[in-house]
Structures are given as C-alpha cells and as structure tokens.
UniProtKB/Swiss-Prot annotation:
UniProt keyword terms in alphabetical order: Oxidoreductase, PQQ biosynthesis
Annotated source species: Xanthomonas oryzae pv. oryzae (strain KACC10331 / KXO85)
Name of the top EC class for this enzyme: oxidoreductase
InterPro entries: Haem_Oase-like_multi-hlx, PqqC, PqqC-like, Thiaminase-2/PQQC
Family from the record: Belongs to the PqqC family.
EC number(s) per entry: 1.3.3.11
GO terms under biological process: pyrroloquinoline quinone biosynthetic process; sulfur compound metabolic process
Lineage: Bacteria, Pseudomonadati, Pseudomonadota, Gammaproteobacteria, Lysobacterales
Protein name in UniProt: Pyrroloquinoline-quinone synthase
Catalyses which reaction(s): 6-(2-amino-2-carboxyethyl)-7,8-dioxo-1,2,3,4,7,8-hexahydroquinoline-2,4-dicarboxylate + 3 O2 = pyrroloquinoline quinone + 2 H2O2 + 2 H2O + H(+)
Pathway named in the protein's UniProt entry: Cofactor biosynthesis; pyrroloquinoline quinone biosynthesis
Function statement: Ring cyclization and eight-electron oxidation of 3a-(2-amino-2-carboxyethyl)-4,5-dioxo-4,5,6,7,8,9-hexahydroquinoline-7,9-dicarboxylic-acid to PQQ.
A GO molecular function held by the record: pyrroloquinoline-quinone synthase activity
Gene3D superfamilies, alphabetized: Heme oxygenase-like
HAMAP family the record matches: PQQ_syn_PqqC (MF_00654)
Length: 250
C-alpha cells in the first residue's frame, strides 16, 4: 500500500503529472506556436477552443454550488467573473470572441457550436460531468492544470505574434489576462488540495483528477490534429475553411 505523502511530496507528484501530460507536449501546439499552421487551421483551433472557454464558468458554477463554506465561495466566484465578465463586453469569453473575430470567423457560427468537432464537444462535456459528479476535492484538483498555463501562454503569444501576420497582440488579449488569473487560481487550488488530501486514498483521487483533466485537454488537440493536420478526416458538419468560406467574415 502506498504511504501517505507530505503536502510538498504531493505537490511534487502533481507537478510531475503536468510535466508529462499537460497539453503543451502535444504536437498540435508545437505546430501552432512555430507558425506551421495556415490561417484556416488556426481558425479551426480558435473556433473549437471556444467551446471549452464557454464552459469554464459553467464548470466553476457547478463547483461553487457544492461549496458550503461562504468564504470558499467568495474566493471561487471570482473565476466566474473572470470569464463571464461584468458585462457582455468584458471577461474571458468576450476576449476569446474578440480573437475569433480578429481571425475572420463569423461570431454567430462560433457561438452556435454548429461547426464543432465531436471530439471537442465530448471532451468538454466529460469535464463538466466530472466536476458535477466527483467529490469537491477532486473537482478542485482537476483545475490544477492552471499550474502549467503561464508557460504555454508565453510560448503561444510569442510564437503566434512572430509567425502569423494575421494575428495581433490586441487579438491575443485573452492570454495577457490569464497570465495573472491562472497563477492566482492555481495557487489557491493547490493550497486547498495539499490541505484536504490528507489520506492515501484522497491523494490518489486528486492525482487521478489532474490526470483526467490533462486527458481532456489532450483529447481536444487530438481531435484538431486528426481533422485539420493529418490524416485530415473532418466530421462532415464541422468547420472546414474552404467549404465554409461563406460562413467566415471577409
């Protein structure tokens, strides 16, 4: 039977999971960050990623609803504000739509979800189901992928600005905000997990939760790679840049 880890040992194990499985290791991200994708492939990435962005506040609301401690709720609810904003023109969702606008995608198409890859939809729904059905500790632990976000954000912004003349720093404003939001959120979640994962069984559960979340992010990139890189098998109802030219703004 495994021994109970100290909080710092648990953190080390969690960071090791991220180092091995976080989606910064996925080949699609290497292509994106090194300028190896064309405009249509970048559009497909942004359109599909919106489904994940759209569901982040739904995920956080599901977690919030299960918190009995008002102090904990006051901290967690900031995540919802970060993405929903205080109006329709601010927050993470609005900033992601600003990116898809800048890439030339029709906003109605993006928001409708009509052109999503099935793999994107299924991965995001699996994540929502996970945080709704698992323990609060597991749900919070699943958010720990944010520990690794600042590094990939830095790579993404620098790489996209360097290699794509159709991308501007203004279009990438979403990521600038996440550079401060993600560390704040992950620091809190990590402290919570280290404090509350106080048995061998709970420690195994939080590690499994992070492993699962990494698989959710990886699966979304798998779907994009199969459809838009190789072998190029696109779901008939999903976004296809050439075919959908009439549905993409000029």
């Amino acid at each position: 039977m495994s021994a109970l880890l100290s909080p710092d040992q648990l953190e080390a194990d969690l960071r090791a999971i991220g180092a091995r499985l976080y989606h910064d290791q996925h080949p699609f991200h290497a292509l994106l960050h090194h300028g190896k994708l064309d405009r249509g492939q970048v559009q497909a990435w942004a359109l599909n990623r919106f489904e994940y962005q759209r569901c982040i506040p739904l995920k956080d609301a599901a977690i919030l609803a299960r918190m009995e401690d008002p102090a904990l709720r006051r901290i967690w609810r900031q995540r919802i504000v970060d993405h929903d904003g205080n109006s329709a023109t601010d927050g993470g969702i609005a900033r992601w739509l600003h990116l898809t606008d800048a890439l030339g995608l029709d906003r109605t198409l993006v928001e409708s979800g009509r052109a999503l890859l099935p793999g994107t939809r299924f991965a995001v729904q699996a994540y929502l189901q996970f945080v709704s059905e698992k323990s609060l500790l597991e749900a919070i632990a699943s958010s720990l992928t944010e520990l690794f976000a600042p590094n990939i954000i830095g790579q993404r912004v620098a790489g996209m600005l360097k290699h794509y003349d159709f991308v501007s720093s203004d279009a990438l404003a979403y990521f600038e905000h996440r550079l401060t939001e993600a560390p704040r959120d992950s620091d809190f979640a990590l402290d919570y997990v280290k404090q509350h994962a106080d048995t061998v069984e709970k420690q195994a559960l939080v590690k499994a939760a992070l492993h699962f979340k990494c698989s959710v992010l990886w699966a979304q990139l798998d779907a994009l790679h199969v459809a838009y890189v190789t072998p190029g098998i696109v779901w008939p109802d999903a976004f296809v840049p050439d075919r959908d030219a009439s549905r993409v703004a000029a």
